[in-house]
A protein has these predicted regions:
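PRPP-associated nucleotide enzymes
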Residues: 1-221
Length: 221
């Protein structure tokens, strides 16, 4: 089998290779707990120090994505994080989370870092943009594809929920993809945004694409 922790390190390493020479943050951090392993992989590859600018406090709080109300999800996510101001004040941070779904919690986390004195917050999700709702599992509380930040942004950009060229937004070499990423980064107030590419993620996993489900990223069944 594939060791998941080792795979997360490889994902972080691949993100760092794509970033080489483009950003110079002071520290690399992961949103606890989901982004920690990816951030360690990024730090090891890039040579930029790994740090923990906030500590996760979990007693009495459930998983933040589980409540049905967005305001409750945001409150739980915020209350779980305790800032370490000495590691944030005046610093440029590169922040890694496992994914961006709705975008609301990561925007709150970014604002939380700015309020704590961060100079820059570069965001690197450790999975590609989610463009399609999962038709196979019932893991998320999402009830509509328009819950996804990508689809809301595409609608704002094009005026339609289901553009004919939707597949282009899954191609990291396309103008549509890059316009979407730039729009999301500005909307969520990130200094910069770069997603993990699907081809890099498949390489990080180490399993042939034909044996992996990639539907939520590229719509291929």
């Amino acid at each position: 089998g594939i060791n998941v922790e080792d795979m997360r390190y490889r994902c972080g390493s691949m993100l760092a290779r794509r970033d080489a020479g483009t950003v110079q943050p002071d520290i690399v951090a992961g949103v606890p707990d989901s982004g920690i392993a990816h951030a360690i992989g990024y730090a090891n590859e890039s040579g930029i120090p790994f740090s923990r600018p906030f500590i996760k406090y979990t007693p009495t709080w459930p998983r933040s994505f589980m409540p049905t109300m967005q305001s409750q999800r945001n409150l739980i996510a915020k209350m779980k994080l305790i800032p370490v101001h000495e590691l944030i004040q005046g610093r440029s941070l590169l922040l890694i989370d496992d994914s961006i779904v709705r975008g609301t919690q990561l925007r709150e986390t970014t604002e939380f870092l700015y309020q704590s004195g961060a100079r820059e917050v570069h965001v690197r999700p450790a999975c590609p943009p989610l463009l399609y709702g999962c038709k196979y599992l019932n893991f998320s509380r999402s009830t509509s594809v328009m819950d996804l930040i990508t689809r809301r942004v595409i609608k704002e950009m094009t005026g339609t929920e289901e553009p004919a060229d939707l597949a282009k937004y899954a191609d990291p070499e396309s103008g549509e993809y890059n316009a979407m990423i730039e729009y999301i980064g500005k909307k969520l107030n990130f200094t910069s945004l770069r997603y993990h590419r699907l081809d890099d993620m498949i390489q990080s996993v180490g399993i042939d694409k034909c044996k992996l489900c990639t539907y939520c990223w590229d719509g291929q069944e």
